């Protein structure tokens, strides 16, 4: 039994590992995905739960915190998925039961297991995202992600709208002649630095500014519009 602290109710709850994992898979991925994806998510959820339990201070009464991004109760899942709930639950239960008590370790300890929706063919190293090396979170090929329909997306803005978005955050920007230069990328393709007019910002800042699905992108300007091409999600 795991003791979890529910952010919404501010109460500590007792959950079996199996019940937590079912609710975690409901919350953390799309239940309509392939069963293998649900199995992977169940392993990730167990790994992260054990990682947090192993690091909690002695004075803490609960094992870890939950919210609706991390776990859905039965009533919350029913509300979110409606008529699809029963079929999804059966599918998730099968995935959770199939992986049993598997979890990921490094040097015999549970790892921190971050995840994302799609990469652009190569995952990112922890150092490129957090600025800190993590021995087991290294960049690796993931070519299968490129087969997904959502692997590439495009957003178009008029020149005026593009300027408006940038100026809302950087009112002193000089954008009379729209231009952009990507200054550097990580090995996985994520933009590290970009120059727009007289501005220099990080790829993550640009992503947040335009609410992009990814910081791996290209920008194309023409007389009519600005097109941002994004690769991957998350």
What are the language-model segments listed below?
Residues 1-234:
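Conserved, single-site charged/polar hotspot
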């Amino acid at each position: 039994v795991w003791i979890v602290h529910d952010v919404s109710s501010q109460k500590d709850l007792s959950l079996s590992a199996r019940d937590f994992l079912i609710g975690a898979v409901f919350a953390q991925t799309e239940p309509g995905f392939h069963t293998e994806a649900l199995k992977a998510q169940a392993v990730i959820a167990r790994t992260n739960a054990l990682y947090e339990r192993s690091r909690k201070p002695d004075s803490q009464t609960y094992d870890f915190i939950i919210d609706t991004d991390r776990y859905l109760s039965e009533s919350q899942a029913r509300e979110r998925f409606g008529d699809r709930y029963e079929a999804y639950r059966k599918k998730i239960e099968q995935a959770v039961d199939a992986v049993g008590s598997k979890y990921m370790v490094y040097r015999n300890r549970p790892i921190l297991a971050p995840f994302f929706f799609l990469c652009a063919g190569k995952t990112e190293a922890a150092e490129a995202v957090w600025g800190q090396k993590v021995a087991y979170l290294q960049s690796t090929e993931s070519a299968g992600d490129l087969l997904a329909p959502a692997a590439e997306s495009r957003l178009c803005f008029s020149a005026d709208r593009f300027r408006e978005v940038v100026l809302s955050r950087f009112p002193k920007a000089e954008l009379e002649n729209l231009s952009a230069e990507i200054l550097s990328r990580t090995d996985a393709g994520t933009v590290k630095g970009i120059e727009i007019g007289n501005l220099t910002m990080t790829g993550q800042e640009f992503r947040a500014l335009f609410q992009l699905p990814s910081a791996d992108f290209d920008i194309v300007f023409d007389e009519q519009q600005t097109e941002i091409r994004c690769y991957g999600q998350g």
